[in-house]
Amino acid sequence: MLNSCINKIKKKKNIKKIILMLIFIFSVNFFTKNTNQGKQYEDKLNKDFTNIKKINIKNKLVNQKEFLLQLEKIKIFSPNLYSKNISIYNAILKWLKKRAEINELNKFRIKLFQMKGVDQYGNVKITGYYTPIVKASKIKKNNFIYPIYRTPSNFKKNEKLPQRKDIYNGFLKKEYILAYSDSLINNFIMEIQGSGFIDYGDNKPLIFFGYAKKNNWPYTSIGQILIKNGDIQKKNISMNTIKNWCTHHTQKEIQNLLEKNKSFVFFQETKRKEVYGSSAVPLVEKAAIAVDKSVIKIGSVVLVKIPVLDKNGIFIHKYEMHLLIALDVGGVIKGQHFDVYQGIGEKAGKLAGFYNHYGYAWVLKI
């Protein structure tokens, strides 16, 4: 009888140990899963925007120079937009001139409205975009065999243009070809980014190809396809990992993947030397963001706590404070999501490709 009781007690203790072990493992996994992308869990936010009287942040701004340059470009290129937001712009300029702390914004009549994020804990999705430089030729030669198209003129305004697969198979006339690149995936990336600089080589000036039109077919994320197929883990998906996948697959396999996205972007050659957002204002790297304008008005200033990444794109559990201005939109930028403009070229592209993270954001108002 005594031995039976002892065995029952031991079993209960073992069960408790197992339960505690499972709770610990679950907690560690949950914490790791939700912090390797910069997510934070503090107060729950019930409103889309919650007025915060004061934030206790001692970090300094890291992009003051870029922010001031971006403000100047708004003033020059869009006086109307500047005028609409002049009260908040002037208040921020006074705050910067006094070299005041972030937790002193309220002393300058600046109100902070924290965004609820994707999960009501303030975690706003942060991605990056950039302007690629694509090597190309005006004629088809050597490795330059992948056409970049302008908008076909023989279609009605709201008519669906050919889908990607048909275009790849030569449906459009050659007269609509602007240039030939040496990389199908680079053409695709330029479509995703919405524009790009074309490098014809021989030290010729770069030519800017701007967005002209879509073919009106639905957009399908090739990243989601690669995740579903088990080629790339969801936590690792980025433009960099997609490009890496391409380097290990044949051209036919790459084309088959891209054809699953029926949407296609056409371009137009322009004389612009700077990259413009939808606001018709030149974008300054690390100062401009693309937003969902049904959530954030164009011209709005947002204070954002952005995760810091190492050279391999790994979050190092540190954050930097940025002042960003909403000057662009994007087809896949929906809801509580910012796309931070990273600049021009390969280095900017690598950084933009890393970002699929989360940070706190406060819209600044008077």
UniProtKB/Swiss-Prot annotation:
SMART domains: MltA. Keywords: Cell wall biogenesis/degradation, Lyase. Its EC number is 4.2.2.n1. GO terms for biological process: cell wall organization; peptidoglycan catabolic process; peptidoglycan turnover. SUPFAM superfamilies: Barwin-like endoglucanases. InterPro entries: 3D_dom (IPR010611), MltA (IPR026044), MltA_B (IPR005300), RlpA-like_sf (IPR036908). It catalyses: Exolytic cleavage of the (1->4)-beta-glycosidic linkage between N-acetylmuramic acid (MurNAc) and N-acetylglucosamine (GlcNAc) residues in peptidoglycan, from either the reducing or the non-reducing ends of the peptidoglycan chains, with concomitant formation of a 1,6-anhydrobond in the MurNAc residue. One of its GO terms (molecular function) is hydrolase activity, hydrolyzing O-glycosyl compounds. GO terms for cellular component: outer membrane. It holds the Pfam family MltA. Coiled coil: none annotated. Murein-degrading enzyme. May play a role in recycling of muropeptides during cell elongation and/or cell division. NCBIfam families: PRK11162.1 (NF008366). This is Membrane-bound lytic murein transglycosylase A homolog. It comes from Buchnera aphidicola subsp. Schizaphis graminum (strain Sg).
